């Protein structure tokens, strides 16, 4: 993996690897894998040949703690109704406090379905400013070693590495990802961003402060 053009450094991403078997409060085969502990969700819709991605993040219970990517899902060629039904099933298994949904493009259909059974669902309508805020939030957490995921899911690190910084025609900083066969357009990384939107930049407490534009 090469991080020469990436917003994220490979050395920082490698600190995100964790052995989920050492998480005593997490049992992925249980009806309630985290019991009644709170979780946040993030959804990135499918575009062109990309997968849709949904991630579940367990936020820290104490100030400065770790965010843990508990589960991630990739859905290809599935209708927005089918995807929303899978998320409905997950809402029955986890104690969601926040679900951020990218509604730019095809995500709006999934969002409308989710909102019917989870009114706290938050639409994420990307602007240059909002995308910058969310990328900086992920960078803040990763550099502070406060974001963890299963070491076997190294495609998550690959996805973050494909995110590059650019400049718009008007001179604003922007972020985008090149497409690869393994990561699409960084689908799982973009799914993490709406989920992590529940913690504001510079706020280490894990409280829910959602960016909406």
Language model regions located:
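ATPase catalytic-site recognition across NTP-hydrolyzing enzymes
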Residues: 1-43
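Short, flexible loop/turn elements at secondary-structure junctions
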Residues: 17, 45-49, 105
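Generic recognition of flexible, low-complexity loop/linker segments
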Residues: 24-31, 40-45, 86-90, 110, ...
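Gly/Thr-rich phosphate-binding beta-strand-loop-beta motif of the actin/hexokinase/Hsp70
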Residues: 33-60
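Phosphate/oxyanion-binding active-site loops and adjacent basic polyanion-contact surfaces
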Residues: 50, 76-83, 184-190
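Hydrophobic beta-strand positions in blades of beta-propellers and related beta-sheet-rich domains
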Residues: 52-54, 69, 175-177
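Mg2+-dependent endonuclease catalytic cores in nucleic-acid-processing enzymes, primarily RNase H-like
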Residues: 62-170
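Charge-patterned, long linear interaction tracts outside catalytic cores
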Residues: 163-213
